[in-house]
Amino acid sequence: MAKSSDSLNKKLLAAAVGATKAKDIKELIEKGADINTHNEWGLTPIMLAAQYNRSVVVAKALIEAGADIHEAEPKYRSNALHLAADNTTNPKVIEVLLDAGANLDARNYLGETALIMAVNSNTETKIATTLIKLGADINARDYQGHSVLDYAKLAKRTYLVNLLKEKGAV
């Protein structure tokens, strides 16, 4: 990879985390940055945006430029939707990924779906409720057999426990 391309790719990875405007992303792509470049941990710009950036316009710009929303990072095999479910505070980021075709019930290497990750790790209840509203499998179980409801109980997420039961989760 040419030094200038490497520099552009590093700038794109940084912009995915911190940019607030679509133009910041588009300019780097137009200059030749690789939309699916990887950082040292194997994360792509869309994964970083989903995990750290709450900006819907940045996520949309990356997707419109051809970001692979299905690619999974190498360590845990989590994709952009998993990372957003685990970390974002903006449910619109979840919606943008799903509108672009992200698999709502894709599993990482532990068998966790985005909903399991949201219930287990994300303190923003609205992320889990958004996933439920959009049709996530409320009876999904990880590879150890723990259900979404199990994780909600373990995390003492009373509102989610009640919502899941109301929706028929077991």
For every predicted segment, state its role.
Residues 1-12, 100, 134, 143-144, ...:
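Ankyrin-repeat-protein effector appendages
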Residues 5-14, 38-45, 72-80, 107-113, ...:
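Ankyrin-repeat boundary/"N-cap" motif
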Residues 14-20, 48-55, 83-90, 117-124, ...:
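Ankyrin repeat A-helix N-terminal signature
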Residues 24, 57-58, 92-93, 126-127, ...:
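Conserved ankyrin/ankyrin-like repeat signature
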Residues 26-34, 60-68, 95-103, 129-137, ...:
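Ankyrin repeat domain, specifically the short helix-to-loop turn at the C-terminus of the second helix
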Residues 72-78, 82-91, 95, 99, ...:
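Alpha-helical adaptor scaffolds
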Residues 107-155:
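Ankyrin-repeat and related helical/solenoid repeat scaffolds used for protein-protein interactions
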